[in-house]
Amino acid sequence: MKIVEVKHPLVKHKLGLMRAHDISTKRFRELASEVGSLLTYVATADMETEKVTIEGWCGPVEIDQIKGKKITVVPILRAGLGMMDGVLENLPSARISVVGVYRDENTLTPVPYFHKLVSSIDERMALVVDPMLATGGSMIATIDLLKKAGCPCIKVLVLVAAPEGIAALEKAHPDVELYTAAIDKGLNEKGYIMPGLGDAGDKIFGTK
């Protein structure tokens, strides 16, 4: 599995700000979107382009254009919504597919409860976005669903990943690509990433 820890200074700076215990909902939400945008820039660097001719101000001009059906953005509900605006800044025409998975707090196992995928998923690259890759269960369940629907290419964008989640994802889906702003130390006894960001969903939505 291709694993990319994006070490750009802007990414590291913004992620560092997100780790503050007293960060406001507004600021956390802004930074999640900004880091999501930067991760998207890196993750799409290998997209194929094709030459097309358009009418420019001085006559015909040849330009590069993204080839094919392009992309669907797949936020995992609910926390993935916090990164979606940043992704769409770079890909404003991307179609959106939504997957709902929550983690049972007692067993730490993923529980899928909703999905709505674009009809042309079998012709698109999927960018799956979720702030945290902890145990990997929710991400694996989402990718299982995408592959079952025929999605040919899947890339994962997360703010923070734990080694345990990376190992689980690589074992289940070695063909996907992972882009993360940080690989942290590991999980605590409750399955939270340490030092991590805390509960990203609660911080994005202001529910705690």
From Swiss-Prot:
UniProt entry tagged with the keyword Transferase: yes
SUPFAM superfamilies: PRTase-like
Free-text remark on how the cofactor is bound: Binds 1 Mg(2+) ion per subunit. The magnesium is bound as Mg-PRPP.
Residues annotated for 5-phospho-alpha-D-ribose 1-diphosphate binding in this entry: 78, 103, 130-138, 199
Pathway in which the depicted protein is active: Pyrimidine metabolism; UMP biosynthesis via salvage pathway; UMP from uracil: step 1/1
Family according to the record: Belongs to the UPRTase family.
HAMAP family: Upp_B
Name of the protein this chain belongs to: Uracil phosphoribosyltransferase
Organism, scientific name: Sodalis glossinidius (strain morsitans)
Origin organism lineage: Bacteria, Pseudomonadati, Pseudomonadota, Gammaproteobacteria, Enterobacterales
Gene: upp
